[in-house]
Every structure is written in C-alpha cells, then in structure tokens.
C-alpha cells in the first residue's frame, strides 16, 4: 500500500525529501563550521544556527513525509505549499510529541541504568537482566510512538493524547508492530550498507551514496508507516 501511494506523486515526494535532507545536512555543516572558528562569538552563532536548522529541518521532514504518506494512502494529492508552510498548532504538537518520545526513552534508559548499577553492586551474576529490561523498555517506548506523527496529523491529538494512543496501539497490536520492525530497520540500514560498499569500491564515495540512498529510502519508510497506521488506527476495519 505504501509503494502504491508513492507512485501517486513521485517527483513531489522525493523532491521534498531531497530538499529537507539538504537543509538537515546544512545544519550539520553550520554546527561543524563553528568548531574550527577562532571567534567565540561567530562560533556560538554558527552552533546556534546549526542546531536550529537541524531541529527545524528534522521536524519539517517528519511532518512533510507523514502528511504525504497519509494523503497518498487515502488517494489524495498534495500541493507544494501544503508541505512548505508551518501548520501552527499541529506542527508544534508534532515537535512536542517528538520531544516527549525522546525524553521518555531517555527516562527509561536512565531507570534501567540505575537498576543495572544497583544489581551489579548487590548481585553481579544477575546484572545482565536489568540491562536487557532497559533495552526492552526503550525499544517499547520507541515502538509505541512509531505512529505519533500520524496520530497528531490525522486525528489532531495533543502530544500527551497521541503518546497515550501510541501506548494503547502497542498493547493491542504488538505482534503486528514487531513484525513491521525488521522491515523498517532493514530499510533504515540500507543507505549505510550501500555507503560502506561504495566506500570500499572508491574512497570518498561513501558519504555521497549514503546521503542519496537516505533521500530515496526515507519516503519509503514514511509511506510504509503511514500504510500500517491506516490499518491499525482506532476504528480501522
């Protein structure tokens, strides 16, 4: 279903992916340029601009690809201005939802680290158990929020409500989500594998191939997630 949706507007979809990824890389470049600058003021300015552009382009990329996936899954076409503009409350909700996910995963990791430290001190032979539980907890948080952008954009939920709906979806459909996870991980790993192969064939080619492959793969990932959301969302038949 996701691949069928991608055929609806291929130029818009991959053109948007290329532009958003380009801005994302520009943010990285500005931040890196600040490290080699002798002027403290200019270095601070470059760092601030880099972080700001990095964060804004990441949110724009996730929101845009999610909107495209939802629209194409419903058989609707989108226009460029619908992707380019800031959507006010929805965009803020999406940004806060992503922040909620990061903080929740960090909290789960911190709790797991504290439990591991305690068990390592008291029962060293069992120290692997809290480590495994911590990894499982972080993975569960991230997997439960796989549809967070779709919930915010499609159902116009608040960040906290979208988080709760994500947890509920995981509790009801965890076998389907676990089955989807290897495919998404394989798609995400594909650009890096191609980059390593290109670097082995010719020095200096790895980064360029990785970036180009990432531009191509990200819309496929977003379309797959959006198609899965349409099947598993509340009220879906």
Each model region followed by its residue ranges:
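Hydrophobic alpha-helical membrane segments
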Residues: 1-237
